[in-house]
Regions:
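Long, charged/polar, low-complexity intrinsically disordered N-terminal extensions
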Residues: 1-12
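Generic serine detector
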Residues: 6, 69, 97-99, 107, ...
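Extended alpha-helical interaction modules
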Residues: 16-276
Length: 448
């Protein structure tokens, strides 16, 4: 299911303290619910015109963080925007960020061992409320990964062919590189930038074009093209339309795979942490959670997990690049192995319980065989049950039934020890005295 919120019209960002705020238009704000997977993904699209490239990179780096990654000496949040404000159609502020409230975030983490999120993001998600918060809400959520949100960027710029290699790197890796830091030219992912992250099927670097470059790091996808190209700007049939409706789905599916696998892994961890092997209720709850998680994983594998997404080689290459950088295949193998181990544990535990049941039934059968042979030898009419009054026969039946039930229950209670005794009897190397001690232990529960 997809739910759309329409009361948020604009986003006002103050990137750093003292800078003039920037207003971006909110195109749409959606929540994607995957009920099968207990997963929610938020999709926010904003746009702006005539921004400097440096400002675009700053927005990509600072915006889209669920909570501050730290605080500076003045108490302001690190790496996030100084202030983010959601505005309604009438210009009124709906919510604003609170990254400077350091105590709020730290106290929440200390109490719940889970991160809090900034107020402007929490406002967008209401009536959903954070899992450990004090807010009242029927639906609760929690982050399944770190604070950096996946981001897609569509950049139409004048003369993209004039960009230097450093500009390309800083634009494509804007979410990873701090705008004020020098470029780390010696690290492999910078030296191999074009090979690792660029898909240049539609980049010719010629005057006739096309000059559209796709850059994917897994957590971010950036499409850069020529602002003078009508096809690049066409929102019905051009690259912009493909970006919104096709490449968005490619990016969404790749992150759906990763998010789902992280959910499965987290459910396993929670189930193990909640397990108390000395508590039967906890053990039964653990088994139910593991089996339910296994069933959901099977549905995910057959419904959502696939590698071939499109017949177009370029789209398929983009999808594979995203999935490779997100390590989806390795994560899938890891989660599948964990679930298989849990399933094998439950199967072995069930087999152990069945074996114990078979042992008990075997002991009871042997005791019943003794009783059957004995009564068969002496005949079934030793006691004239058919004679006497009706009351005497009823009383006789109740007493006999009570005795037999008591013997069966005693045999069940001592079945493990009686099984050990039968094993001792079948052992030819044991002496008669040791076999007698085994019988004594089976009946009384202690050594002779």
């Amino acid at each position: 299911h997809v739910f759309r919120r329409s009361d948020v019209a604009r986003l006002r960002l103050t990137l750093r303290e003292g800078l003039a705020p920037i207003e971006l238009h909110v195109v749409h704000l959606d929540l994607y619910f995957f009920h099968d997977l207990d997963l929610v993904q938020m999709n926010l699209e904003v746009r702006a015109d005539n921004l400097p490239l440096a400002t675009v990179r700053e927005i990509l780096f600072r915006f889209g963080r669920a909570y501050p990654s730290g605080w500076d000496e003045e108490g302001e949040g690190l790496h996030n925007v100084y202030l983010a404000e959601w505005l309604g159609a009438d210009g009124q502020v709906i919510a604003r960020s609170d990254s400077a409230q350091r105590t709020k975030y730290l106290s929440f983490v200390c109490e719940h061992r889970s991160p809090n999120i900034s107020e402007h993001w929490a406002c967008l998600l209401r009536p959903l409320v954070l899992a450990h918060s004090d807010e009242v809400g029927a639906l609760r959520y929690r982050l399944i990964e770190y604070h950096r949100m996946p981001v897609m960027a569509y950049i139409a710029m004048d003369q993209p062919r004039t960009l230097s290699r450093e500009d390309w790197i800083r634009t494509g890796l804007a979410t990873m590189l701090h705008p004020d830091e020098a470029l780390p030219v010696n690290v492999p992912w910078i030296a191999e930038f074009e090979k690792r992250y660029c898909q240049d099927r539609y980049w010719t670097n010629t005057a006739s074009g096309p000059n559209t470059r796709f850059i994917s790091t897994g957590n971010a996808m950036t499409v850069v093209g020529d602002a003078d190209s009508r096809f690049f700007l066409d929102n019905e049939r051009g690259v912009l339309a493909q970006f919104r409706h096709q490449y968005f789905l490619v990016f969404l599916i790749a992150h759906l795979h990763r998010a789902s696998l992280l959910v499965f892994s987290e459910v396993l961890v929670d189930a193990v942490n909640d397990l108390d092997i000395r508590n039967d209720v906890s053990v039964r709850r653990f088994k139910r959670r593991i089996r339910a998680n296994f069933e959901t994983f099977l549905r995910f594998t057959h419904r959502y997990w696939f590698h071939e997404l499109s017949e177009r080689p370029h789209v398929q290459a983009i999808f594979r690049m995203c999935a490779r950088h997100l390590r989806n295949d390795a994560l899938y193998d890891e989660v599948r192995s964990e679930i298989r181990e849990m399933s094998n544990y439950l199967d072995s535990d069930s087999q152990r319980r069945q074996s114990n049941t078979v042992v008990r039934l075997t002991v009871i059968t042997i005791l019943g065989l003794i009783a059957t042979v004995t009564t068969g030898y002496f005949g079934m009419n030793i006691i004239p049950f058919g004679e006497g009054s009706v009351l005497e026969r009823i009383l006789h039946g109740l007493i006999a039934s009570s005795i037999f039930v008591g013997l069966v229950l005693f045999a069940v209670a001592r079945s493990k020890r009686l099984s050990d005794f039968l094993e001792a009897v079948s052992e030819e190397k044991l002496s008669f005295s040791k076999k007698t001690r085994a019988l004594w232990k089976a009946l009384l529960g202690k050594e002779a």
